[in-house]
């Protein structure tokens, strides 16, 4: 079983992911979605957490061997990033969604040197907007952002476009395609549900029609 499949299985087992193709969720953006993901739940399950953190470490070593500092996005990327940095014996920092409105007005908390090679940790990629904003902030403060590594992606076309336009490499440990395949195999969804979930990936607006 691949890492992506193992993580997808764990996310379903611990109910970090809910699939309701016949009774969709409403995202903050207003999009009706057959999937809801809360990867913060993974922190409460040592087996799942260990699988994910070890997956992060191996992925970073394989794709970004020159990394010098790990950064987590506030707030979801912070605990994962701190664990990864500890496992890799690397410095850690975190990136706020916006600068503090008091004190030194920092957007990056922790010490990042000019030109230091950074990998940013995120828990979930939908469109990628927030983590790309974090990457831009890190670059403005002098970091050399090598890429983003995340637990899971919905594989939305908008995310691919956004990362391509930003020139930022994205690697994820698991993904939507893998998850719905595992969900069908393990009986979480019906054939009709799988069909709707596949349609959502292709067209987030008209998938119910």
Swiss-Prot record:
Listed InterPro entries: OPRT, Or_phspho_trans_dom, PRibTrfase_dom, PRTase-like
CDD domains from the UniProt entry: PRTases_typeI
Keywords carried by this UniProt record: Glycosyltransferase, Magnesium, Pyrimidine biosynthesis, Transferase
Binding residues for orotate: 126
Cofactor: Mg(2+)
Parts forming coiled coils: none
Residues annotated as binding 5-phospho-alpha-D-ribose 1-diphosphate: 96, 100, 102, 122-130
Record bears the keyword Glycosyltransferase: yes
SUPFAM superfamilies with a match to the protein in the record: PRTase-like
One Gene Ontology molecular-function label: orotate phosphoribosyltransferase activity
Pfam family for this entry, one: Pribosyltran
GO biological process, one term: pyrimidine nucleobase biosynthetic process
EC number(s) per entry: 2.4.2.10
Record pathway: Pyrimidine metabolism; UMP biosynthesis via de novo pathway; UMP from orotate: step 1/2
Gene3D superfamilies according to UniProt: 3.40.50.2020
Domain of life according to the entry: Bacteria
Catalytic activity line of the entry: orotidine 5'-phosphate + diphosphate = orotate + 5-phospho-alpha-D-ribose 1-diphosphate
PANTHER family cross-referenced by the UniProt entry: OROTATE PHOSPHORIBOSYLTRANSFERASE, URIDINE 5'-MONOPHOSPHATE SYNTHASE
Function as written in the Swiss-Prot or TrEMBL entry: Catalyzes the transfer of a ribosyl phosphate group from 5-phosphoribose 1-diphosphate to orotate, leading to the formation of orotidine monophosphate (OMP).
Quaternary data: Homodimer.
Family listed: Belongs to the purine/pyrimidine phosphoribosyltransferase family. PyrE subfamily.
Stated name of the protein: Orotate phosphoribosyltransferase
Annotated organism of origin: Streptococcus pyogenes serotype M1
């Amino acid at each position: 079983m691949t890492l992506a499949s193992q993580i997808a299985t764990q996310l379903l087992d611990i109910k970090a992911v809910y699939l309701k193709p016949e009774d969709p969720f409403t995202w903050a953006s207003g999009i009706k979605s057959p999937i809801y993901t809360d990867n913060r739940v993974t922190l409460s399950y040592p087996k799942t957490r260990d699988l994910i953190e070890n997956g992060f470490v191996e992925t970073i070593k394989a794709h970004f061997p020159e990394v010098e500092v790990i950064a987590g996005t506030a707030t979801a990327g912070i605990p994962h990033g701190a664990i990864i940095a500890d496992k890799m014996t690397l410095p850690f920092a975190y990136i706020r969604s916006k600068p503090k409105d008091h004190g030194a007005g920092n957007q990056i908390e922790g010490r990042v040197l000019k030109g230091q090679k950074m990998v940013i940790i995120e828990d979930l990629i939908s469109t990628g907007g927030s983590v790309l904003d974090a990457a831009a902030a890190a670059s403005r403060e002098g970091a050399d952002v090598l890429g983003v590594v995340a637990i899971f992606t919905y594989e939305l076309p908008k995310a691919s476009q956004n990362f391509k336009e930003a020139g930022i490499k994205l690697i994820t440990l698991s993904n939507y395609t893998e998850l719905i395949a595992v969900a069908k195999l393990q009986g979480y969804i019906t054939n009709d549900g799988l069909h709707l979930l596949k349609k959502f990936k292709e067209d987030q607006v008209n998938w119910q029609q």
